[in-house]
A protein has these predicted regions:
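Transmembrane beta-strand segments that form the barrel wall of outer-membrane beta-barrel proteins
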Residues: 254, 339-341, 588-597, 639
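Surface-exposed loop/interface segments of Gram-negative outer-membrane beta-barrel transport/assembly proteins
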Residues: 117, 132, 244-303, 345-444, ...
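Hydrophobic beta-strand positions in extracellular immunoglobulin-like domains
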Residues: 46, 111, 200, 374, ...
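Extended, hydrophobic alpha-helical segments in both membrane/secreted and soluble proteins
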Residues: 212, 357-359, 508, 572-578, ...
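Residues on the lipid-exposed face of transmembrane beta-strands in outer-membrane beta-barrel proteins
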Residues: 240, 269, 322-326, 357-363, ...
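Short, small/polar-rich motifs associated with maturation and membrane association
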Residues: 1-358, 362-371, 446-447, 684, ...
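Conserved C-terminal beta-signal and adjacent last beta-strands/turns
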Residues: 23, 323, 362, 762, ...
Length: 1014
């Protein structure tokens, strides 16, 4: 440019005006020519830093100009630029990048997520909303952390991820996962509603967790009211991965893990068992069992079975998935195929195997959007077997060491006990579960098709139809066998039970939405009509009478019986929602839903759900001066009413047996009798929730914090009310709306992300507190008793209710001076006379602690440096008590096996102990429900830890990303609990939630995995 300037001065000084003008033109042409010669073509590929996948539609702008281009479906671009230019790469939800051209002709860019933005879109009921605009309580799951939980059930992924959400699971392959949101809201069903891609499902059990894109938890009435009667226990919304316009991308993930029981019990070996059991017999005035008497010829000295060593082995877990994604704007696709298998860590055929496929298609043509979803799952589960309600784990721990695992002389080939030799009733769990076949097969097909058309600007109509079909076959064959004197199955008892059936659910959603922006005002409205139908069919057959080795088919049984049942449930709902925002400062939302269901009688089959919520973004107010490091302050609150309709079909119709007979003067006369007396006025349970919260964003929103308080009042709860025996009903009670309870608590969550340096890290944590109080039980307030628990008005649901101990009777004088304690002897437990009436009775039982954790928490830590990354997920709960029934059984001093603690039992020469004398029959009931077996349920776990390494791949390789990782689960448990795991899954999640009767312990799992993107 300096040369041209001098040329201009020279021409102006020496040449006439015409010649000077000609010189100017020549100079301009030269300048243009020089400029053209300085431009260059810059090309490159833009990818997502998160998954290394091409990013189509990214804008590339030359700074300070209008020159712009976009990336194609493969993420490629080309643009003319000068060395002095700066390219700006930008795209929605990604942080913009500026790169100087200089001499570069190829510039590849990896765009990072814009972590400072609060414009993340979250899925809510029948729609989406910006996270910053939420006025209700919606917990967003950190999927990067949640997906590192190796599991067959997506519900397990929620554990510790969202404040106020508690999850209980077990180590049984394919076992049930128990999830609660903000405590217990009902005496019956407390399970939340699951919605997958807009489809209502009972649970996500049949769906591959690896195919999930996002998960949101709707916790308050404002967010869940749009689901009406189903939303009372909270809603979990799951969105699976959708197709993205672009070239075909293939992802493969493979994982193989090894599972072992994390903790074993200390139980007695042969000598310890024989010592304690012999003492128990002598204390009861009995002779020593021949098998335990060294002076008897039947004394057992050659069998010393450690049943835990015999049963526990290394279980295997496998998970392989293959996903395809790509397409065009007209039709994009995502298909995921997933295989999962888990063999048990107990030596038995029990395992769980599942094959699933999910296909999502979506596209857009002008004003018309459309899509479909097709999913299929086939699963096979071999179930564990228990005897008369005793769990397999409880039976395993109680198995005596003088019983062999195998015995070729017994029918079936497995060992057992002998009544005359050992006198013990002890189940060979290994033999029991290898002889019995208990299989469940499931085939599930789901389909969904939808279309959305924009009628005029802002006004859209959407039609959504879905279909869900489950077919199942359950078979249980109990063959003729001999597992000891108490567990002999004769030919007449050998049986085959077969249950086949199907469940079909159809939904039709008609939705109309409208959006309008007028200056600072924004309106969003939703109106809809929802129809549904559920059909259930079951056919069962039973065959009895099989010879040993006979084919387990119904036609070979000596006798057969069969039956079937069929049920249909229909429902119609009307929904509406309105959102209003003024100047991005004041937010308001209202929801309304009316449900009508055939579950209730005609007079009570309709109910209304509604909610109101509002938010104030203080940080957007001009009159509030905030420090620079404070970016966001928002206050929000909500109130709403929901319902609960989880009752059986025809629950309002009394059942009559018209084939009953009555005995009159020794003659049978025909007649009728009431089978079940039901309330024709039974109605919906009600749930009202109030919620207030404060949200903060600091340091460019890298640090975010939320504090929340809620009160949830449940009324009209279904509960059994006693009936006079004159009604003829059995049981003599009727279930009606006569219960109420309250849950309240605080919830806190915080997160911090730092991605500005070579070492990137993030920290997130959540804490939830909960207080449960029962307000009403029936008409007269009669308490409800569970296993070692009592539910009473004014207290928490399912509190432990037991006796208190006061040492051991050391001599006859102490025994005589104590309150009357029937059948007590020296060496027995002394119980406290709580009511002071001079005798020990049921009236002396007291509440010993709540079983619902007072607090639960979770913490995610993750970091990455260059190609390495590491993450840890800690989770815990506390403030609750656990009744350790397994420990009670092992401390009973009877014929079953014992805890090693029993070796320190009381004797006249060993009085400095708190372990009572063993005595057969336990006349003093030393093993009754008491604080001897109540323990703190507090724990903290290293639930997941993963270390990954991203293998460098050439830019020209067809492999876009390759990663190796090592994953560990349940690696460390910090707890004082004696049992295998304080995080157990109780069969009864309500009245006996804190009763550990032998749930399958969660195993310690170490997995090796590979991820490859093509």
């Amino acid at each position: 440019m300096k040369t041209n300037h001098r040329l201009f001065l020279y021409c102006n000084f020496l040449l006439p005006k015409k010649e000077w003008l000609l010189a100017i033109i020549v100079m301009l042409m030269a300048t243009i020519n020089v400029s053209a010669q300085n431009t260059q073509i810059v090309t490159g590929i833009v990818t997502s830093a998160k998954d290394k996948m091409p990013a189509p539609g990214v804008n590339i702008l030359i700074k300070g100009t209008n020159t712009v281009t976009t990336t194609d479906l493969d993420g490629q671009y080309s643009i003319k630029a000068a060395p002095s230019d700066i390219l700006i790469f930008s795209y929605i939800s990604y942080a913009s990048q500026e790169i100087a051209v200089s001499t570069k002709t190829q510039i590849n860019v990896a765009l990072k997520d814009d972590l400072t933005a609060l414009d993340e879109v979250v899925v809510i009921g029948y729609g989406t909303q910006k996270k910053s605009d939420l006025s209700g309580s919606v917990g967003v799951v950190n999927m990067e952390s949640a997906k590192k939980t190796v599991t067959y059930d997506a519900a397990k992924m929620l554990q510790g991820q969202v404040a106020g959400v508690t999850v209980q699971s077990s180590g049984e392959p394919g076992g049930f996962v128990n999830i609660k949101i903000r405590g217990l809201n009902s005496f019956s069903n407390n399970n939340p509603l699951f919605v997958i891609d807009g489809m209502i499902v009972d649970s996500p059990f049949d769906f591959a967790p690896g195919d999930i894109e996002s998960m949101q938890v709707l916790k308050d009435a404002s967010s869940a009211a749009i689901y009406g009667v189903r939303g009372a226990n909270g809603v979990v919304i799951i969105t699976t991965k959708k197709g993205k316009a672009g070239k075909l991308n293939i992802k493969y993930k493979s994982l193989v893990g090894f599972q072992n029981v994390a903790k074993t019990w200390d139980v007695t070996d042969r000598l310890g068992y024989q010592n304690i059991t012999s003492a128990a017999e002598l204390n009861a005035g009995l002779s020593v069992a021949p098998g335990n008497d060294p002076n008897n010829s039947s004394y057992i000295s050659d069998v010393n079975t450690n049943w835990q060593d015999a049963a526990y082995e290394t279980g295997i877990i496998e998970n392989h998935s293959l996903a395809f994604n790509g397409g065009t704007e007209d039709l994009a696709y995502n298909m995921n195929m997933d295989y999962f298998k888990n063999t048990s860590y107990i030596k038995s055929p029990q395992d769980y195997e599942r094959l699933s496929m999910n296909l999502n298609l979506n596209g857009k043509k002008g004003k018309f959007k459309y899509g479909t979803k097709i999913g299929f799952t086939q699963s096979d589960k071999e179930n564990f077997n228990s005897y008369v309600g005793e769990t397999a784990i409880a039976a395993l721990l109680g198995a005596i060491p003088t019983m062999p695992v195998y015995d070729e002389n017994r029918l079936g080939g497995y060992g057992g006990t002998d009544n005359l030799t050992q006198r013990a009733i002890s189940l060979n769990v290994i033999g029991f579960n290898n002889l019995i076949t208990n299989n469940g097969k499931r085939n599930r097909f789901i389909g969904n098709i939808w279309g959305e058309y924009e009628i005029v600007k802002g006004l859209k109509y959407k039609l959504d139809a879905s279909f869900d079909r489950l077919d199942y076959v359950n078979r249980k064959f109990v063959p003729q066998s001999d597992l000891g004197w108490y567990y002999i199955t004769t030919k007449e008892e050998a049986s085959l039970d077969v249950s086949t059936g199907n469940e079909t659910k159809t939904f039709l959603n008609n939705l109309l939405t409208y959006s309008l922006d007028i200056n600072k005002h924004r309106f969003d409205a939703l109106a809809g009509w929802v129809q549904e139908r559920k059909d259930y069919y079951n056919h069962w057959s039973r065959g009895v009478g099989y010879d040993f080795g006979e084919i387990s088919k119904l036609q070979y049984a000596d006798d057969n019986s069969t039956g079937e049942s069929e049920t249909a449930i229909t429902g119609t709902s009307y929904i509406s929602r309105i959102n209003y925002s003024f100047d991005d400062r004041y937010l308001f939302q209202a929801n309304f839903r009316q449900d009508k269901s055939s579950l209730f009688s005609e007079n009570y089959n309709t109910t209304n759900a509604y909610s109101f919520s509002g938010a104030w973004k203080l940080s957007n107010e001009k009159f509030i001066n905030l420090p620079e490091w404070v970016n966001t302050i928002k206050l929000r609150g909500s109130y709403g009413k929901l319902g609960n309709n989880t009752i059986p079909a025809y629950f309002f119709a009394t059942t009559i047996n018209s084939f009953a007979g009555y005995n009159f003067n020794n003659e049978l006369a025909p007649g009728t009798t009431v089978v079940a007396s039901l309330d024709p006025n039974v109605r919906w349970e009600d749930n009202k929730t109030t919620d207030v919260a404060l949200e903060l964003g600091m340091f460019n929103n890298a640090l975010q914090f939320t504090a929340e308080y809620f009160v949830k009042n449940s009324s009209n709860l279904l509960v059994g009310v006693p009936l006079p025996f004159s009604t003829g009903a059995f049981p003599a009670s009727i279930t009606t709306n006569a219960g109420a309870m309250r849950n309240k608590g605080f919830e806190f969550s915080a997160s911090y992300n730092n991605n500005n340096n070579a070492f990137k890290y993030s920290i997130s944590a959540n804490l939830g507190t909960l207080k449960n109080e029962v307000l009403q039980i029936g008409i007269n307030g009669n308490p409800i008793y569970g296993a070692a628990s009592k539910t009473e008005v004014g207290r928490s649901m399912g509190e432990i209710y037991a006796y208190e101990t006061d040492g051991i009777f050391q001599n006859a004088a102490e025994l005589a001076a104590a309150p009357t304690q029937t059948n007590a002897g020296v060496g027995d437990i002394r119980f406290k006379d709580i009511n002071g009436d001079g005798m020990i009775s049921d009236l002396d039982r007291t509440f010993q602690g709540v079983t619902i954790p007072k607090y639960s928490y979770g913490m995610n830590l993750s970091g990455s440096y260059k190609n390495w990354d590491i993450s840890m997920f800690w989770q815990g709960a506390g403030g609750n008590k656990v009744f350790n029934s397994i420990y009670r059984n092992l401390m009973s001093g009877q014929y079953g096996n014992h805890s090693t603690d029993m070796l320190n039992y009381w004797t006249p020469t060993n009085t400095n102990t708190d372990i009572p004398r063993p005595i057969i029959g336990d006349p003093n009931a030393n093993g009754r429900d008491s604080n001897r077996f109540i323990e703190d349920g507090d724990y903290i776990k290293l639930q997941t830890m993963e270390i990954g390494y991203e293998i460098p791949v050439p830019a020209t390789s067809f492999i876009q990303k390759a990663k190796l990782f090592v994953n560990g689960q349940n690696l460390l448990i910090i707890s004082k609990y004696r049992g295998s795991d304080p995080d157990f899954n109780s069969n009864d999640g309500s009245f006996s939630r804190g009763y550990d009767g032998g749930s399958f312990p969660n195993p310690r799992t170490v997995s090796l995995g590979l991820e490859v993107n093509f």
